[in-house]
From Swiss-Prot:
Record family assignment: Belongs to the adenylate kinase family.
Protein residues bound to AMP: 31, 36, 57-59, 86-89, 93, 157, 168
Pathway membership, UniProt: Purine metabolism; AMP biosynthesis via salvage pathway; AMP from ADP: step 1/1
Range of residues in the leader sequence: none
Catalytic activity: AMP + ATP = 2 ADP
Domain text: Consists of three domains, a large central CORE domain and two small peripheral domains, NMPbind and LID, which undergo movements during catalysis. The LID domain closes over the site of phosphoryl transfer upon ATP binding. Assembling and dissambling the active center during each catalytic cycle provides an effective means to prevent ATP hydrolysis.
Protein source organism: Streptococcus equi subsp. zooepidemicus (strain H70)
Subcellular compartments: Cytoplasm
Subunit relationships: Monomer.
Protein name in the entry: Adenylate kinase
One MF term in the entry's GO annotations: adenylate kinase activity
Function of the molecule: Catalyzes the reversible transfer of the terminal phosphate group between ATP and AMP. Plays an important role in cellular energy homeostasis and in adenine nucleotide metabolism.
Xref: InterPro entries: Adenyl_kin_sub (IPR006259), Adenylat/UMP-CMP_kin (IPR000850), Adenylat_kinase_CS (IPR033690), P-loop_NTPase (IPR027417)
Amino acid sequence: MNLLIMGLPGAGKGTQAAKIVETFELIHISTGDMFRAAMANQTEMGVLAKSYIDKGDLVPDEVTNGIVKERLAQADIKEKGFLLDGYPRTIEQAHALDETLEALGLTLDGVINIEVDPASLIDRLSGRIINKKTGETFHKIFNPPVGDYKEEDFYQREDDKPETVKRRLDVNIAQGEPIIKHYRQAGIVRDIDGNKDISEVFADIKKVIENLK
């Protein structure tokens, strides 16, 4: 079973990916882990990636695609199957993944697409506030500070401000839509309502994956 999980920042993709991997005993392939492993093992692509990162440059697609190919070519992938998380990020990477899978004799069985209303994601992602004195982190909705606090006792990081969050989501939506469309044409996208409780979302995902088998 080879799967890809997609969803906007804050949609709970990381939480659900961990549950999928544990339940179905798949290999979790996340972009960050792949890069770290390739650089630590000094693979051909890992050395190349490090040369860009050390200079503060963006790693070009061909290097990212190469790192993915190196990982998918390892023996444990055919034995256990995988869950791809954080790749592909662009339609060009999606086409490269198609070619990689074909070259390695692998297929993508399903794309789990966690859908959450962007407006509620802005609330989720822009709710983080930090106490100016203690540095403690709270969330306006999920973990509000208890006690005699005033609004001016807290600050928000630039990254957490609603307008910054909205810009980030807009970029993710623009990049993600062509990828979803690409996989819809292949008939392998399964949409999941991510507005529900974590356990309910996973129950829906579990049903979908079991029906893919």
